[in-house]
Every structure is written in structure tokens, then in C-alpha cells.
């Protein structure tokens, strides 16, 4: 978050591991980043590592990024050849309005935008989130909830919905159980309507079209 608190971060990672919590490390792929030491640390701690291409949001506008393909090539020079980690997924293919066939397809592991690779000299998986050079908007299944209760639909735009207004709505003449049920229904309806209008794609390649002005530390993850 722009502070020199490395010791606190490392202590926090260790504490989380000791508590048995699942831990992974996300690192922004900046041009001046030395990824080797970070990979060695993650390997030593047995923690999955993911590299995220820098996006022109907030402080990201001030830095020069590089593609994850370039970074992966750099890591191969140090840790051997890499291979995408996939699994066989069963998928249905429509032949006609009455006939379907079932076939298998190799797809990347995980349910998000990261594509994971196994390097021959590493035991940990290394993931790459390539928002710029591997645009994955058509399969994006992510929204963000800010600390202010605002549901963001895309990092590129300020579009979304303020869930606080719904939570603070007055429900009178009902018992607490019915009030909670009514609020849940309102939240579900509002979130579905907002997500249905999620932008088709980001516009990071055209920063002048961006409408989001907040820093990532305010947006959250």
C-alpha cells in the first residue's frame, strides 16, 4: 500500500500460516521488479505466487509495467521450463435442438482470471493475471465491494451501486426476522441488476476513456 512495512507483511504471512489460513502472494509486475527473490521466498514458504500486470489505476499510472509473458520467460531462465496447469473439463456441445455431445477440454485450473504454471525446478504453482496483454474480460466473473459499501463492476469505470442505501432503508411494522429477509431480497435484486449491466470490457488501452479516479487502496480487492 505504498509503505515501507516489509517486516510487518512477512510477520503477517507467517502468523496466517501458523493459524492454518490459506495464503497466497500477489505481486504487481513492475518493470523494476526483481522477481527471482520473491519466487525463492514463496518457494521456501510453500506459498502460491501470482503476478499481476500493472494497470493504469491510481498509482499504477506512475509506473512502467511489462507483460507477464516477458516475465514468464525471465523465470524460465532461472527455474526451468514452464507448463500451464490444466484439468480435463467435461463440456456439452449442441449438435441440434435435440442432440448434445459430451467432450473433454483442457482448461486452466482455478475459478478466476489467473493462469497457473508449473516450473520444472519449483514445487509451487506460479500464476499470471494478464489484464493488459491477455485481456480476459469476456470470462471475467469478478466484482469488488469497497470499504464504503459500493459494489464496483469494473476497475476501469466508476459504475456500480451503493449498497449502504439499501442496508439503511427503513423497514417498519415487521419483526426482525422479516426485516432481515426483506433486506436480503432487496440486496439480491439490486446486485443482480447491477451485475447484469457489468461493462463488456475494460478500456485500459485507452486511459482517456476511464472514469475511475480512486486509488486501489480505496477500491480494495
Which residues fall in each region the model found?
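Auxiliary Fe-S-binding modules of radical SAM enzymes
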Residues: 44, 54-57, 61-221
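Radical SAM/AdoMet-radical enzyme domain recognition
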Residues: 1-52
Amino acid at each position: 500500500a505504498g509503505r515501507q512495512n516489509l517486516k510487518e507483511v512477512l510477520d503477517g504471512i507467517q502468523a496466517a500460516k501458523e493459524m492454518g489460513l490459506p495464503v497466497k502472494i500477489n505481486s504487481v509486475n513492475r518493470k523494476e521488479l526483481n522477481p527471482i527473490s520473491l519466487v525463492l521466498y514463496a518457494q521456501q514458504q510453500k506459498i502460491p505466487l501470482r503476478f499481476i500486470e500493472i494497470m493504469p489505476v491510481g498509482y499504477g499510472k506512475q509506473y512502467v509495467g511489462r507483460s507477464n509473458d516477458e516475465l514468464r520467460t525471465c523465470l524460465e531462465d532461472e527455474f526451468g521450463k514452464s507448463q500451464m496447469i490444466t484439468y480435463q473439463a467435461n463440456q456439452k456441445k449442441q449438435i441440434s435442438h435435440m442432440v448434445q455431445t459430451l467432450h473433454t477440454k483442457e482448461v486452466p485450473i482455478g475459478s478466476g482470471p489467473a493462469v497457473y504454471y508449473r516450473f520444472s525446478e519449483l514445487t509451487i504453482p506460479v500464476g499470471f493475471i494478464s489484464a493488459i496483454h491477455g485481456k480476459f474480460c469476456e470470462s471475467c466473473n469478478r466484482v469488488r465491494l469497497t470499504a464504503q459499501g459500493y459494489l464496483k463492476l469494473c476497475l476501469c469505470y466508476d459504475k456500480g451501486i451503493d449498497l449502504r442505501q439499501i442496508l439503511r432503508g427503513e423497514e417498519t411494522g415487521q419483526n426482525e426476522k422479516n426485516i432481515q429477509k426483506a433486506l436480503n431480497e432487496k440486496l439480491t435484486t439490486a446486485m443482480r441488476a447491477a451485475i447484469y449491466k457489468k461493462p463488456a470490457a475494460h478500456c485500459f488501452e485507452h486511459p482517456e476513456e476511464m472514469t475511475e479516479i480512486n486509488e486501489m487502496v480505496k477500491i480494495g480487492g
